[in-house]
């Protein structure tokens, strides 16, 4: 198991409290949403992976927000396409 000091992660984010929020969001993405880690897993838990990504500057609150907006746009586009397909099916009857 990797030993992670949070000082580098805190320095990347700015303060300890925001770092915790960013790390929790990223760990949840990895563990629950199935997002791929940006660093080697090395048999680490999602929280450790999230902290390592933050330390390297790969993850910030802004990158998480942008990723979330992209996910919402993709979901909305899929819903619109599904509705259009249903409407198209009704028009051909």
UniProtKB/Swiss-Prot annotation:
Any one Gene Ontology cellular component term annotated for this protein: DNA-directed RNA polymerase complex
A GO molecular-function descriptor: DNA binding
EC annotation from Swiss-Prot or TrEMBL: 2.7.7.6
Entry annotated with the keyword Transferase: yes
Organism domain of life: Bacteria
Gene3D superfamilies hit by this protein: 3.90.940.10
Any Pfam family the entry gives: RNA_pol_Rpb6
Catalyzed reaction equations: RNA(n) + a ribonucleoside 5'-triphosphate = RNA(n+1) + diphosphate
One GO term of the biological process aspect: DNA-templated transcription
Class of this enzyme: transferase
Keywords: DNA-directed RNA polymerase, Nucleotidyltransferase, Transcription, Transferase
SMART domains xref list: RNA_pol_Rpb6
HAMAP family cross-referenced by the UniProt entry: RNApol_bact_RpoZ (MF_00366)
Annotated family: Belongs to the RNA polymerase subunit omega family.
Oligomer status and interactors: The RNAP catalytic core consists of 2 alpha, 1 beta, 1 beta' and 1 omega subunit. When a sigma factor is associated with the core the holoenzyme is formed, which can initiate transcription.
Role this protein plays: Promotes RNA polymerase assembly. Latches the N- and C-terminal regions of the beta' subunit thereby facilitating its interaction with the beta and alpha subunits.
The protein's name in its UniProt record: DNA-directed RNA polymerase subunit omega
Upper lineage: Bacteria, Pseudomonadati, Pseudomonadota, Gammaproteobacteria, Alteromonadales
